[in-house]
Amino acid sequence: MIDAEQLRRVSVKVSSETAGLLRDLACSEDLGRVVSGETTVADKRAEDYILDLLRRELGQVQVISEEAGGVASKTSDAPIALVDPLDGSTNYLSCITWCSVSVAFADPRSGEILAGSVAPVYAGMPVSFARGKGCYHGGLKVEDPSIRGSIISVYVDEPGAIESVAGAIGRLKGVRRDFKVRSLGSAALELAYTAIGYIAVFADLRARLRNIDVAAAVGAVRECGGVVTDAHGQPLRIGVWRVERVGSVVASLDEALARIAVGGGSG
C-alpha cells in the first residue's frame, strides 16, 4: 500500500491538473449538455481525465465516482479513490468562478481516509492533507491552523433546511455578532477553506451530501485539527466502498462553534 504522503501528492497533481482542464474549457456552450442522469459533458470530460491520470500515476486503483459508480473490494491492495470531478457544476456552467475538483484516497481494508486534495477550478491553491502528516495550502504546510474568517457557510435549497439553518445562525450570532452568512455553491471548497480557517463554520443540514462530495475536504478539516459532525453532533462517518450519502455536515476548527451550530452548546 502506498503511504499517505505519496497519495497526497498524487491527489494534488490529479485535482490541480483537472482543475486546469476545466478552466481551459470554461464557458463553452456544449459543456452543459446532459449525457446521463445528472451528469453533464463537463462532468464526464473531467472524470475521464481523472481516471486516466490516476491509472498513469498509480497503476492499480479502485475508483468510486458518480459516473463510474463502482464497488471497491476490501481484500484488494489497490487504494480506493473517491472522486468528485466537478463540485459546483451549476456555478461552473453559469460561468461563476466558485467550483472545485476533489480527490481522496482511502485504505480498502480499514476504510480510513488517508489523503486528499480539493483544488479550486479558478483562483486559489489546493487544500490537501495526508493522514498523520499534516495539511497543506498549496505547497506550504499549514502550521497551527486557526479561524481567521467570520463566514458561516450554509446551504438552504431543500425543504426544511432554511428553518434548521436559521436556528444554527441565530445561535452562532449569539456568540459573535460579526459572523456573516454565505452560500457559495461548492460544498467541498467551502469545507476545505474551513480546514484552513478562512471559513469559521460550515453547516449543510440538507442531508444530501455524498461521500464523494466531501471525503477529501472532511479529511482536511480533521487533519488540520477541526471537527466534523452530523446534524446531531456525532462524529461524521464516511463509507468509502461505494457511492453513498453521508447526510448533514457541520464543521469548524473550533469544536465549541460546531457544537453550538447543532444546538449542543450555549451561546
UniProtKB/Swiss-Prot annotation:
Catalytic activity: a myo-inositol phosphate + H2O = myo-inositol + phosphate
Protein name as catalogued: Inositol-1-monophosphatase
Keywords from the named record: Hydrolase, Magnesium, Metal-binding
Record organism: Aeropyrum pernix (strain ATCC 700893 / DSM 11879 / JCM 9820 / NBRC 100138 / K1)
GO BP: inositol metabolic process; signal transduction
Family: Belongs to the inositol monophosphatase superfamily.
Residues that coordinate or bind Mg(2+) 1: 66, 84, 86
SUPFAM superfamilies per the UniProt record, alphabetical: Carbohydrate phosphatase
UniProt cofactor(s): Mg(2+)
InterPro entries for the chain: Inositol_monophosphatase-like
Sequence positions that bind substrate: 66, 86-89, 182, 213
Residues that, per the record, bind Mg(2+) 2: 84, 87, 213
EC number(s) recorded for this UniProt protein: 3.1.3.25
Classification via Gene3D superfamilies: 3.40.190.80, Fructose-1,6-Bisphosphatase, subunit A, domain 1 (3.30.540.10)
Any GO MF annotation of the entry: metal ion binding
Keyword Hydrolase: yes
Enzyme's top EC category: hydrolase
